From Swiss-Prot:
Chain positions recorded as Zn(2+) 2 binding sites: C101, C104, C107, C115
Pfam families, alphabetized: ADH_N, ADH_zinc_N
The name this protein goes by in its record: Alcohol dehydrogenase 1
Major localization listed first in the record, in broad terms: cytoplasm
Protein family per UniProt: Belongs to the zinc-containing alcohol dehydrogenase family.
Keywords from the UniProt entry: Cytoplasm, Metal-binding, NAD, Oxidoreductase, Zinc
UniProt binding sites for Zn(2+) 1: C47, H70, C157
Organism: Neurospora crassa (strain ATCC 24698 / 74-OR23-1A / CBS 708.71 / DSM 1257 / FGSC 987)
Listed InterPro entries: ADH-like_C, ADH-like_N, ADH_Zn_CS, GroES-like_sf, NAD(P)-bd_dom_sf, PKS_ER
CDD domains, sorted: CAD3
Compartments where found: Cytoplasm
């Protein structure tokens, strides 16, 4: 078993009060408990959820002070005495779901994210915007040794989340899926997972740069909501028979796209809600929902099996992660870009900088 020298202090980005900003400072390195591992985080993806955690604008209380982040890829450097499924030296990832009880009805039916005792990385427990992070061994993502940690990091939330959403939609090879918010970090991977699963991807977002990116990633069509005169008609026209997509994956972080989806989804189609606009409501006309037999579902991250499946697509080279890497010290600048809607693809922070 390899031995690692573990420092007493480390660099981290800490939210010291609700609303932020983050403070780049040194904090102690924690020791893992009996069922936990300590991961030397090399890279961490930056997710819109991290911004919500800093701002505290979700109806779920955050830990304070808080180290955010839940897409941490690194190396296991220590483990508790009860841990047998993970070894020191393994490549592993910290996900949104840091731990669960493994004993409730949800955990026993592979719905661990719904566990009433779930621990959430970078929200209810400290996450991956630090050089050394703790996670329950049963829930760490096992990253194949051949995978590049820098590009693996965003798969640990964005990849798993959109892959699970596509599974929940029930779409089959040859069918069409509309991806709303396709130019962002989740959307860029959703397009690729859709292609890998044999689906026709219709990308919906705003701006020429995002359109170019979506087409390069394999979207069969791109609908620009900033220039279209009739979004509903354009989305339907992008499907082979003009009847609309079989499923809609809503990754948007504003409310309006959720209302629009009912108008263009195919009859007997499924709308999957993933994006979490603060304070938003989903309003759908009851008449249309009933007579067109529309299904509306929420999809929330993924379980342990979903995690390994999503990573397998990546390990086989079917998913490319378009990233921009900056030092951990620049995290607040990434949040500022996120607030302004200027992010294309996914930002990753390097914890060594």
């Amino acid at each position: 078993m390899p031995q690692f020298e573990i420092p007493e202090q480390q660099w981290a980005q800490v939210v010291e009060k609700k609303g932020g900003p983050v403070v780049f400072k040194q904090i102690p390195v924690q020791k893992p408990g009996p069922d936990e591992v300590l991961i030397n985080v090399k890279y961490s993806g930056v997710c819109h959820t991290d911004l919500h955690a800093m701002k505290g604008d979700w109806p779920l209380a955050t830990k304070m002070p808080l180290v955010g982040g839940h897409e941490g890829a690194g190396v296991v450097v220590a483990k508790g005495e009860l841990v047998t499924e993970v070894e020191v030296g393994d490549h592993a990832g910290i996900k949104w779901l840091n731990g669960s009880c493994l004993a409730c009805s949800f955990c026993m039916q592979a719905d661990e994210p719904l566990c009433p005792h779930a621990l959430l990385s970078g929200y209810t427990v400290d996450g991956s915007f630090q050089q050394y992070a703790i996670a329950k061994a049963a829930h760490v993502a096992k990253i194949p040794k051949g995978c590049d940690l820098e590009t693996t990091a965003p798969v640990l939330c964005a990849g798993i989340t959109v892959y699970k959403g596509l599974k929940e939609s029930g779409v089959r090879p040859g069918q069409c899926v509309a991806i709303v918010g396709a130019g962002g970090g989740l959307g860029s991977m959703a397009i690729q997972y859709a292609n890998a699963m044999g689906l026709h991807a219709i990308a919906i977002d705003g701006g020429e740069e995002k359109g170019k990116n979506c087409r390069e990633l394999g979207a069969q069509a791109y609908v620009d909501f900033t220039t279209t005169k009739d979004l509903v008609a354009d989305v339907k026209a992008a499907t082979p028979d003009g009847l609309g997509p079989h499923a809609v994956i809503l990754l948007a972080v504003s409310e309006k796209p959720f209302h629009q989806a009912v108008d263009y989804v195919r009859s007997r189609g499924t709308i999957i809600c993933i994006g979490l606009p603060a304070g938003a409501k989903f309003q759908a006309p009851v008449f249309d929902t009933v007579i067109r037999m529309i299904t509306i579902k929420g999809s929330y991250v993924g379980n342990r099996q979903d995690t390994q499946e999503a990573l397998d697509f990546f390990a086989r080279g079917l998913i490319k992660v378009p990233i921009k890497t900056v030092g951990l010290s620049k995290l607040q600048e990434v949040y500022d870009l996120m607030e302004e809607g200027k992010i294309v693809g996914r930002y990753v922070v390097d914890t060594s900088k």
